[in-house]
């Protein structure tokens, strides 16, 4: 039973929860007496803590602002959170009149039907810092039951304080974006006695809160700035380039304007734009189209043919299988070898032809020199031959006469010798 009572007084508080109620661990005196009458017993440490609280007073405890619930949660939900006890025992031990427990009396049931309002003085509850754990993830606090009259209607907090409370609730109610973008400062409300004392470790989470707020601010700012198609921010004022399609009619007008201005070399984008006078065209469109027009006009046809041939050859090579490709490579290698040998033979023939020509020139020169030498030798000999021939004509006549006479003498002498010829 003691374990059940202790379990009902434990509340787990996480660092990220800012507005959880923190209460004084000292139980109310009338609860101690009522619990003793009912047969319940409290832990000695809890009773000593209550006595210490009565001696020192409530001014020495740290406080944290919280908001009392206006509507009671379902009894089944709270009963499930209390380990080892039912809902009736939990409500009776804590003296919470906003929940129904008719088994303990009709006065508490009547108080549960009345609307619950927390006064300004009840917004702060003392907490014993010595009972806080060193662990920053989960902390356990001992809650003191609240003492109030069943039929008393407490006044609502002042409007200004209610506005501050609603504003702080808005910080953690899922709408931090509007507050951060509007530039509203962060507000933390604490009672005056908290300012002079060290803050609880559970409340020392503004650093985590600031990180979350900064991240939300960056996300909101990044989502609120649209980006243009050119990559510039919408508020930068940079002109966005629109794309147009150059139809045949538009291109013909462009060519006419270029010809009027003296050709593609002399035409300027500004002059073409002025002559065309077409809606939607800008100087950037004219510059780009004029550059393409110049490139297409002055590109050599041979280079285009070579490019087309190379592309066709590349496509054909891609369509061939590896075996055929190897055969073609081998044939090309053989052809290169033949061409190399032909080139070597042509070079040898050329060198031989040059040598033959040089030798012919030398022979021609030798013949000319020989003719000159022979002419110089033959001229005096010819003169001698002419003189000798002229002198030899007279001698021949004398020799002829002598020969005739000798023949005559010989003939007569033969006849006289008695050798007569026999003629039949």
UniProtKB/Swiss-Prot annotation:
The keyword Phosphoprotein does not apply. Homodimer. Interacts with PHR2 in the nucleus. Interacts with SPX1 and SPX2 in the nucleus; these interactions prevent binding to the promoters of target genes, thus regulating negatively leaf inclination in response to phosphate (Pi) starvation. InterPro entries: Homeodomain-like_sf, Myb_CC_LHEQLE, Myb_dom, Myb_dom_plants, PHR1-like, SANT/Myb. It comes from the Eukaryota. One of its GO terms (molecular function) is DNA binding. GO terms for cellular component: nucleus. Residues 342-391 form a coiled coil. Residues 144-165 are annotated as: Disordered. Its main location: nucleus. PROSITE patterns: HTH_MYB (PS51294). Keywords: Activator, Brassinosteroid biosynthesis, Brassinosteroid signaling pathway, Coiled coil, DNA-binding, Lipid biosynthesis, Lipid metabolism, Nucleus, Steroid biosynthesis, Transcription, Transcription regulation. Residues 238-298 form the HTH myb-type domain. This is Myb family transcription factor RLI1. Gene3D superfamilies: Homeodomain-like. Transcription factor binding to specific DNA sequences of target genes promoters, such as the motif R1BS 5'-NAKATNCN-3' and the motif P1BS 5'-GNATATNC-3' to trigger their expression. Nitrate-induced component involved in modulating phosphate (Pi) response and homeostasis together with PHR2; activates directly the expression of Pi starvation-induced (PSI) genes upon nitrate disponibility, thus triggering the nitrate-induced phosphate response (NIPR) promoting Pi uptake activity. It is found in: Nucleus. Residues 269-294 bind DNA. Belongs to the MYB-CC family. A motif (LHEQLE) lies at residues 342-347. It holds the Pfam family Myb_DNA-binding. One of its GO terms (biological process) is brassinosteroid mediated signaling pathway. Disulfide bonds: none annotated. The keyword Metal-binding does not apply.
């Amino acid at each position: 039973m003691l374990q059940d009572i202790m379990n009902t007084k434990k509340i787990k508080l996480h660092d990220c929860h800012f507005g959880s109620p923190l209460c004084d661990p000292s139980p109310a005196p009338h609860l101690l007496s009522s619990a003793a009458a009912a047969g319940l017993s409290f832990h000695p440490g809890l009773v000593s803590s209550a006595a210490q609280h009565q001696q020192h007073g409530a001014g020495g405890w740290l406080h944290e602002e919280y908001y009392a619930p206006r509507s009671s949660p379902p009894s089944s939900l709270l009963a499930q959170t209390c380990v080892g006890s039912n809902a009736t025992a939990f409500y009776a031990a804590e003296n919470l009149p906003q929940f129904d427990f008719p088994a303990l009396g009709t006065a508490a049931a009547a108080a549960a039907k009345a609307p619950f309002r927390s006064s300004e003085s009840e917004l702060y509850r003392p907490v014993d810092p010595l009972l806080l754990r060193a662990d920053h993830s989960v902390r356990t606090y001992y809650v003191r039951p609240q003492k109030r009259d069943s039929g008393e209607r407490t006044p609502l907090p002042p409007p200004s304080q209610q506005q501050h409370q609603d504003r702080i609730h808005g910080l953690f109610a899922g709408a931090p974006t509007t507050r951060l973008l509007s530039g509203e400062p962060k507000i933390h409300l604490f009672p005056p006695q908290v300012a002079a004392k060290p803050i609880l470790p559970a409340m020392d989470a503004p650093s985590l809160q600031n990180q979350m707020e900064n991240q939300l601010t960056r996300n909101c700012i990044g989502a609120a700035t649209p980006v243009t198609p050119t990559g510039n921010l919408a508020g930068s004022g940079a002109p966005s380039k629109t794309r147009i399609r150059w139809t045949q009619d538009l291109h013909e007008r462009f060519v006419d304007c270029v010809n009027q201005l003296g050709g593609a070399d002399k035409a300027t984008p500004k002059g073409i734009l002025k002559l065309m006078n077409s809606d939607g065209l800008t100087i950037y469109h004219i510059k780009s189209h004029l550059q393409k027009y110049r490139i297409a006009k002055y590109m050599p046809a041979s280079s285009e043919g070579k490019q087309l041939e190379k592309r066709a050859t590349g496509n054909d090579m891609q369509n061939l299988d590896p075996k055929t490709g190897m055969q073609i490579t081998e044939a090309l290698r053989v052809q290169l070898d033949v061409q190399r040998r032909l080139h070597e033979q042509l070079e040898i023939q050329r060198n031989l032809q040059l040598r033959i020509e040089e030798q012919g020139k030398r022979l021609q020169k030798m013949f000319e020199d020989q003719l000159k030498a022979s002419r110089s030798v033959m001229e005096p000999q010819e003169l001698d031959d002419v003189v000798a021939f002229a002198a030899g004509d007279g001698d021949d006549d004398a020799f002829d006469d002598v020969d005739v006479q000798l023949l005559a003498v010989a003939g007569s002498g033969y006849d006289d010798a008695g050798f007569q010829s026999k003629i039949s």
